From Swiss-Prot:
GO terms for biological process: RNA (guanine-N7)-methylation; tRNA methylation. The gene is trmB. The active site is at 105. The lineage of its organism: Bacteria, Thermotogati, Deinococcota, Deinococci, Deinococcales. The keyword Zinc-finger does not apply. Keywords: Methyltransferase, S-adenosyl-L-methionine, Transferase, tRNA processing. Gene3D superfamilies: Vaccinia Virus protein VP39. Pathway: tRNA modification; N(7)-methylguanine-tRNA biosynthesis. This is tRNA (guanine-N(7)-)-methyltransferase. Belongs to the class I-like SAM-binding methyltransferase superfamily. TrmB family. Its EC number is 2.1.1.33. InterPro entries: SAM-dependent_MTases_sf, tRNA_(Gua-N-7)_MeTrfase_Trmb, tRNA_methyltr_TrmB_bact. Signal peptide: none annotated. It is an enzyme of class 2 (transferase).
Amino acid sequence: MIFRLGDFRFPDDPARLYPDTPDRPWVLEIGFGDGRFWPHYARTFPEPPNYLGVEISGVSLLKAHRRLKDAGLTNAVLTKLPAEVLVAQVIPHGSLDAIIVNFPDPWPKAGHEDHRLLRVPFFQVAASRLKPGGAALLTTDHDEYFEFACAQAEASGVMRVERVGPPPAALETKYAQKWRDLGLGVNHARFVPTRHDPVPNGTFAPYSEEDPAVPHAVLTLPADFSPQHFDKLTVRGKTWTVVLLDLYATLRRGGWVALAHVVEGDLTQEVLVGITEREDGTHLVRLAKFGGPIITPGVKAAVGAVTEWLEGQGAVVKHRGY
């Protein structure tokens, strides 16, 4: 199955994701590429563990989905998200048996270390998400990143580093085959939690059809409200940035829709905020369901930014629910 961010719960329950195999081990692979690793690795178990794969490439997502389907691996969920968001928001405490990272982007240029996945904050969250006895597994051809990751794991205070040989399946990935053909080796380490300090999952919420749960406002627009142009507007908070990109008139139902770009750390969402007339003549400003948005502080701020822009056009706010 392919999941959007909005298809998950925060945190989610493995029994909900894998209703037919709820008691099997749960493995997360970060950066699965074209999906070659998991069919090989799953065969080393008596029964295929429940699999969750995260990738940022849409092309890779489709290739891996076909490969896992052809292999008959039905207890697999794939998603296109930043890995940091998935691990922090979706995975419950003490639920994973393994986290697998094969050939991650090393971000080799000077000053780009902050873009690397395997840093102290990630290891601290990973230790919380792994079960006792679980581990994070890294395989990489990049020597400097390997040493960097090992040092970061040790500096996290919650991981022990074990430098061992990689599982054979890790050598079947596209990049492993490339380096093997060139006669080059790979590095592998197991990062084993020494503590499982709880790390909260955060404040994400799925879109709900219940009105009180969806960010909204009720207001009265001026009788002559008929916008002919819209200037891009940027609003910044402590943990988010909202950019109102444009305003569109809707033809079928009347009203308008604002397009907002919302950035919160590693998570970026583009959401629609509708402006529709109600039976009593007031207008409802409300986050639209289109695209499966996740309700976050930044998304609430986007609804607030649209509401405040409308106030600047002469609207009178009757109620704020964001």
